[in-house]
């Protein structure tokens, strides 16, 4: 259908606009899968959390399952073996059971070499993927505020 915006597709998925809700949800799931495949590449070189933000985060309940599926995906070899695309456990922060599993991992501490300082350490490679609920402006403000506080501590 021509001229539909992501918001229109969301409205269809929610049953608030005429159209095929199942097709709209599937479109968002596929979007999530493609986004997740791109995130796999980034997360293999960056150690951090994955947060989906922007206008599409409002449709996160339809997008996130595809993202999580892609992040938990595997690749196969010609010999029939498979291995995970990410060398870490993936948790969906928006799913209560997954969130509890992630929190239950617990954190230890490790001593920084040549220092008396200890820092938090998770001895198991793990990542949570979640949705931004603040919007870009508020998230940037929080980041700037945290940065300013760190600068004051120097």
Could you describe each region identified by the protein language model?
Residues 1-154:
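ATP-binding/phosphotransfer module of carbohydrate and carboxylate kinases, centering on a glycine-rich
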């Amino acid at each position: 259908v021509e001229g539909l915006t992501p918001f229109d597709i969301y409205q269809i998925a929610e049953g608030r606009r005429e159209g095929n809700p199942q097709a709209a949800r599937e479109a968002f799931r596929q979007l999530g899968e493609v986004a997740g495949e791109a995130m796999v590449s980034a997360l293999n070189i960056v150690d951090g959390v994955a947060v989906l933000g922007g206008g599409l985060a409002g449709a996160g309940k339809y997008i996130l399952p595809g993202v999580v599926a892609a992040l938990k995906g595997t690749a196969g070899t010609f010999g029939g073996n498979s291995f995970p695309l990410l060398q870490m456990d993936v948790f969906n922060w928006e799913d209560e059971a997954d969130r509890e599993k992630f929190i239950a991992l617990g954190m230890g501490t490790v001593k920084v070499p040549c220092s008396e300082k200890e820092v938090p350490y998770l001895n198991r490679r793990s990542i949570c993927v979640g949705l931004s609920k603040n919007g870009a402006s508020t998230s940037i403000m929080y980041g700037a505020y945290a940065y300013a506080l760190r600068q004051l501590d120097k």
